[in-house]
Curated annotation (Swiss-Prot):
UniProt record, GO biological process: L-tryptophan biosynthetic process
Binding residues for L-glutamine: 580-582, 611, 658-659
Gene: trpE(G)
The organism's taxonomic lineage, starting at the top: Bacteria, Pseudomonadati, Pseudomonadota, Alphaproteobacteria, Hyphomicrobiales
NCBIfam families per UniProt: PRK13566.1 (NF010081), TrpE-clade3 (TIGR01815), trpG_papA (TIGR00566)
Top EC category: lyase
Annotated active site: 607 (nucleophile), 697 (for gatase activity), 699 (for gatase activity)
Name of protein: Anthranilate synthase
Amino acid sequence: MAAVILEDGAESYTTKGGIVVTRRRREASYSDAIAGYVDRLDERRGAVFSSNYEYPGRYTRWDTAVVDPPLAISSFGRSLWIEAYNERGEVLLALIAEDLKSVADITLGSLAARRLDLTINEPDRVFTEEERSKMPTVFTVLRAVTNLFHSEEDSNLGLYGAFGYDLAFQFDAIELKLSRPDDQRDMVLFLPDEILVVDHYAAKAWIDRYDFARENLSTEGKAADIAPEPFRSVDSIPPHGDHRPGEYAELVVKAKESFRRGDLFEVVPGQKFYERCESRPSEISNRLKAINPSPYSFFINLGNQEYLVGASPEMFVRVSGRRIETCPISGTIKRGDDPIADSEQILKLLNSKKDESELTMCSDVDRNDKSRVCVPGSVKVIGRRQIEMYSRLIHTVDHIEGRLRDDMDAFDGFLSHAWAVTVTGAPKLWAMRFIESHEKSPRAWYGGAIGMVGFNGDMNTGLTLRTIRIKDGIAEVRAGATLLYDSNPEEEEAETELKASAMIAAIRDAKSANSAKSARDVAAVGAGVSILLVDHEDSFVHTLANYFRQTGASVTTVRTPVAEEIFDRVKPDLVVLSPGPGTPKDFDCKATIKKARARDLPIFGVCLGLQALAEAYGGDLRQLAIPMHGKPSRIRVLEPGIVFSGLGKEVTVGRYHSIFADPSNLPREFVITAESEDGTIMGIEHSKEPVAAVQFHPESIMTLGGDAGMRMIENVVAHLAKRAKTKAA
């Protein structure tokens, strides 16, 4: 039934189960709406889900929050219970309980005003593989609830929360060897009556408030009060983790024996790290969101002093209409210190056959999971080994889609993928048995999923990775690595520690006001220094000027030829000869250099500027056999001198030249400070005069690594410029 507009502006529609839903919308502050919800979750049940990571065709930015939901559905094993937290929840519980009476495959237990207990019956027949997702499980109840509230009129109303790892064993059972704690919950899903939605593209936020009614039952006018349960910290200090150093590497060796026998192709065991929570969960959530943006950021208060704080990079299952999507992640490398180092790491990752094999196996298993529930021929890889970059890691990701068959729904798709091979392994069932036999503790929420099941039939869930579980004041961080036959045990152990590091940093630094690593500050060595930059019709001269200005120097750029009155007016402390096309003779560089030397001015040459200085002092120039235009080179620093002081023995630089100074005929007063691998001069300094030059471009993107180019410019301004030398004296 289509929604109708009521006199007070509210909207009303009737669900498939005959429930009349009334929705009232009010505007909220876009700038700070989500912050208030995050703070409230320290002492109130609910969830905040955010995407603060964008990827075209895959992820956009959004926020959704629910606090003080009136009802929750929880389970452990085949036991399930539905709890009402206030009078409004009592109405919802009564509506659901009445509907569940007609659901086969469940046994209803005790029913009170605020709690319904029930049991999922064991299957009474053999289910084929094609219909395995229809077996009696806790999802039987979830299907009934979503069917009761089903409507196409609202895309936000649904169930919000977390799905635990052990739910997979209702779909495909294995022998459990690890003991589960008595208070473990495999699922906690909230049914909200108020939802905050933040639309970042429209820069708007609003709150939808819902009332529910059927026959003589209605939430209208019922009390919504729920008592808070403040977070409680503890004084006890937990152990470092559930593995001693080197023990995970030993597990890798055991896994390789399984690979050798053919029992497994890959497996993803994890280890757990502990930290005491000295900050509130909300502070940890804010910190993690700031330092580790992700498409599935979440903060959930599950009640009973249990919280989940996470920044998952991986979609689990997303269903929109009949379309089902997943984005398996496998292949990981550490971020570089800057964009140039990142690019080198990306090349290394893409060239890694091991990482390619990891992702290939993950995606082949994922395609198999979809083939169980999708229309034949509809399962397609729409993105292959695409790069996604996060705060500390770079991943390779595939994007796979399919179309659900008409007899399948989002829950079928969800169950068929439980759990992703990226957190289990392949073959999946054997990998899960290996994990159960070799991990030190039950996974609880790790490796499961978080997110939302819409009453319109859609679903949006992320894998529970990069997650902090806080239980009774102690934080747990679990991280795993994808193991293959050619895995290096020590490297895999280090990868688990690296993956956990961002979570641990968020716990330890939650009270820090700084949300991100600050860039290196440029030294203000140029204050009071005047620089004359001679432009040889170059296309990079303004970037070069920008670098010098960052030191605090005053820069005047003048195209050659430079008149005497320019020198008199600018009164430079340093003359910089820019790069340019052609040869130094095309710009009569000797004349410029002669004027500068007559005034005893320091000179720094870049590219063409080096060639000009070498030629002006009596040297010869030659032409490269192969031009170096826009090409990076690894150069050797022979003498640090002025320019390369504080840099390493090797530096990657950007080159744009066909001409070079002949080293066999370089005037003896010049010292070669750097050269390329083939012996081409890359840097010179005069032994007696304040003159230095480089053949490459310090301002190029290719010289950004380690901020090398900027550091060279700082050195030139600090130690070559005339006024700088005077100050130093």
